[in-house]
Amino acid sequence: VSVTVEGDFRPGNLRLRHAFGEYNGVLMGQTWSNFNSFVGNTSTLDFDSLPGLAGLQFRVAQARYTTGPLSFSLEQPQNSLIDPAGDDAADDKKDGMPAITARFEESQGGLSYSAAVLAHQVGYDTGAIDDDAFGFATFVAAKMALTDMITLQGTLTYTDGANSYLYRSGENFGAASAYVDGSGSVETLSGYGGSIGAGINLGGGRSVNIGYGYVEVDWDDAVSDLGAAAVADQSESNQAIMANYQWTPVKNVMMGVEYQFLKRENVDGSDGDANRILFAAQYNF
């Protein structure tokens, strides 16, 4: 039997990150979603990293069973939907069933790879009217060591009715999974995304990493059913380039500098972009 409890102070006060127990392949508690993999991630200084990474890059309450490279879980569902006016229908959201996931993750020589699927319910219940739909998501991720110095890695994700699991879609971390049309029916929204990157180990604790990520949500049916004005300011695509240099000046200390270019485009065609420089220092103890 093992028990893990971990917290940090990222929001300015103590928050619980992990709290779970494990016994004979059974895990119960809060930790990284089973619909998640880090094998295809490019190393970035930005805590939240690139759009399009594999699955839900968050921690959720769950019950999981692992046997060899296979793992299965029932998890706290993550979904959102918008009403016919284009507003968030969070107050009426129905989460009657857990999300169901299955993942395969393995490594052989210089290749690490992962694939997963997820299914969940997305719906609403106002007390007077209700409806729901089936949503699903899938991803693949891989990392290949080309030489002792160079690695290539990437991810691909597709969702339909599960855009909360399409990393960094929408205005923040996940776009709406569905919308309610004028007749009260739940209609799912699909999306896709991915990332690609390379890492170069320069030796002596020094490395260069560069990655690109992109996600896009298909709002065409929502525009047709709800009208362009209702979803005009919804985020249609997000993309980012991140490039960094990391070094270890002394044992247990990592420092780095990173350049980022970020761009977002809304359903109505309006867009914006930003450039920024990050500096980081990390002490491991």
Model-derived regions: residue spans:
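Outer membrane beta-barrel
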Residues: 1-81, 96-97, 101, 105-109, ...
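Surface-exposed loop and membrane-interface regions of Gram-negative outer-membrane beta-barrel proteins
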Residues: 1-23, 27-29, 34-50, 85-92, ...
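Transmembrane beta-barrel strands of outer-membrane/channel proteins
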Residues: 5-7, 28-32, 72-76, 115-119, ...
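Residues that define the transmembrane beta-barrel architecture of outer-membrane proteins
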Residues: 14-17, 57-61, 66-68, 96-100, ...
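Outer-membrane beta-barrel architecture
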Residues: 20-22, 62-66, 103-105, 139-143, ...
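Detector for outer-membrane/organellar transmembrane beta-barrel domains
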Residues: 107-235
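C-terminal structured domain segments
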Residues: 238-250, 254-258
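Outer-membrane beta-barrel "beta-signal"
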Residues: 247-249, 253, 273-285
